[in-house]
Amino acid sequence: MSTRRRLDAELVRRGLAPSRTQAQQDISAGRVLVGGSLALKPTRLVDAGEPIVVQGPGPRFVSRAGAKLDAALERFDVAVAGVRVLDAGASTGGFSDCLLQRGVAEIIAVDVGYGQLHERVGGDPRVRVVDRTNVRDLDPAVAGDPVDLVTADLSFISLRLVLDALFGVLRPGGALVALVKPQFEAGRQVVARGRGIVTDPEVWRTVLDEVMSACEERGATIMGAMASPITGTDGNVEFLLHARRGDATDQPGPDGAAPDHRGLVDAAVAEALGLVTGPQAP
């Protein structure tokens, strides 16, 4: 039996809207068709396989990743206008596109691939492309002076394995906003059980805890975490993490203990469950 969800929640789950607020606005404006018919209520229940079309202007960003970062910058209140950024795992440029639209001064777009960056992003004079570069082996000299912000959207590698490189190009007090993908963080056996899809909330919880702990072990402070409003292209739940690189003025917690991030983990997992299951019908 298929799961039925509210239309606004289903639009977000499918990546057709970056947030439920935007989904509700699209529905109210008469831009959403369900099964070829105009949908008028965001509370309408729809099946997971039901055809849905959003009419109107094209996507805001060159890839779905842009909407993920946009939601994180809003939630975490990270101001990027005028800053220098290193975008790790730039790919087609979804994160970079979001940053450019928000007024960054410079982006160093790093990716292990070649020629993937969308021409709209790669053609912007504020973007310096660094292709064929494994982020794990990133030379800090690539950035010149340390950057103010590092963003990361990486696949087929654990974020924990590249944290040294990412923090190595970030100035003290600078921010890291990274996409956490459980399918690339959990063990192979765990991922294989779900045929590449990680659905167990306890695995999400473990993954977030391990990534946050790895950041803290490198002197960073965890500032926030959230469930991505859009799943990965394969349907996997993803998370966004905000950390700040420590500096000489940072002080340890009581008795030298690291800050307790369990509350952030619990909140992010609960948010992800809400996105996956949707609100309960009355």
Q: Where does each model-flagged region fall?
A:
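S-adenosyl-L-methionine
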Residues: 105-161
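Flexible, glycine-/basic-rich loop-and-beta segments that form/coincide
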Residues: 237, 242-282
